[in-house]
Amino acid sequence: MTAERRRELRRLEGSSVNLALADGSRLDDVSLISAHGLRVWIFDGGEDVFVPLTKVIDFWPAERVGSAA
Protein backbone atom coordinates (compact mmCIF):
# COMPACT_ATOMS: atom_id res chain seq x y z
CA MET A 1 0.00 0.00 0.00
CA THR A 2 1.38 3.39 -0.95
CA ALA A 3 1.97 6.14 1.58
CA GLU A 4 -0.85 8.19 0.02
CA ARG A 5 -3.27 5.28 0.33
CA ARG A 6 -2.29 4.84 4.00
CA ARG A 7 -3.06 8.52 4.59
CA GLU A 8 -6.46 8.03 2.95
CA LEU A 9 -7.14 5.07 5.25
CA ARG A 10 -6.16 7.08 8.33
CA ARG A 11 -8.60 9.83 7.27
CA LEU A 12 -11.39 7.24 7.62
CA GLU A 13 -10.59 6.53 11.28
CA GLY A 14 -13.74 6.77 13.36
CA SER A 15 -16.01 5.76 10.49
CA SER A 16 -17.37 2.53 9.03
CA VAL A 17 -15.36 0.97 6.23
CA ASN A 18 -15.12 -2.13 4.05
CA LEU A 19 -11.77 -3.89 3.77
CA ALA A 20 -10.64 -6.25 1.00
CA LEU A 21 -7.94 -8.66 2.18
CA ALA A 22 -5.14 -10.40 0.30
CA ASP A 23 -6.72 -13.85 0.81
CA GLY A 24 -9.82 -12.75 -1.13
CA SER A 25 -12.02 -12.22 1.91
CA ARG A 26 -13.72 -8.99 2.92
CA LEU A 27 -14.61 -7.32 6.17
CA ASP A 28 -17.70 -5.23 5.50
CA ASP A 29 -19.14 -2.37 7.53
CA VAL A 30 -16.57 -2.48 10.32
CA SER A 31 -15.61 0.44 12.55
CA LEU A 32 -12.10 1.66 11.79
CA ILE A 33 -10.48 2.57 15.10
CA SER A 34 -6.87 3.13 14.02
CA ALA A 35 -4.73 2.69 10.92
CA HIS A 36 -1.41 3.74 12.46
CA GLY A 37 1.51 1.35 12.74
CA LEU A 38 1.70 -2.08 11.14
CA ARG A 39 -1.87 -3.14 11.94
CA VAL A 40 -5.34 -1.85 11.24
CA TRP A 41 -7.49 -1.85 14.37
CA ILE A 42 -11.16 -2.42 13.67
CA PHE A 43 -14.24 -3.21 15.73
CA ASP A 44 -16.30 -6.00 14.18
CA GLY A 45 -19.21 -7.91 15.68
CA GLY A 46 -18.55 -6.66 19.19
CA GLU A 47 -14.85 -7.55 19.13
CA ASP A 48 -11.58 -5.71 18.57
CA VAL A 49 -9.75 -7.13 15.55
CA PHE A 50 -6.20 -6.31 14.48
CA VAL A 51 -5.44 -6.89 10.80
CA PRO A 52 -1.86 -6.68 9.50
CA LEU A 53 -1.64 -3.74 7.12
CA THR A 54 0.13 -5.97 4.60
CA LYS A 55 -3.07 -8.06 4.32
CA VAL A 56 -5.26 -5.06 3.37
CA ILE A 57 -5.32 -4.63 -0.41
CA ASP A 58 -8.22 -2.19 -0.73
CA PHE A 59 -10.69 -0.21 1.37
CA TRP A 60 -13.63 2.12 0.91
CA PRO A 61 -16.20 3.85 3.12
CA ALA A 62 -19.19 1.70 4.03
CA GLU A 63 -22.47 3.01 2.68
CA ARG A 64 -25.05 3.90 5.26
CA VAL A 65 -28.41 2.22 4.69
CA GLY A 66 -31.14 4.80 4.28
CA SER A 67 -28.80 7.74 3.84
CA ALA A 68 -29.83 10.41 1.38
CA ALA A 69 -27.77 10.45 -1.79
Language-model region placement:
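Short beta-strand-centered aromatic/proline hotspots
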Residues: L27-S34
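Short aromatic-glycine-enriched beta-strand elements
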Residues: L38-W41
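Short glycine-rich, low-complexity segments
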Residues: M1-G24, H36, G46-A69
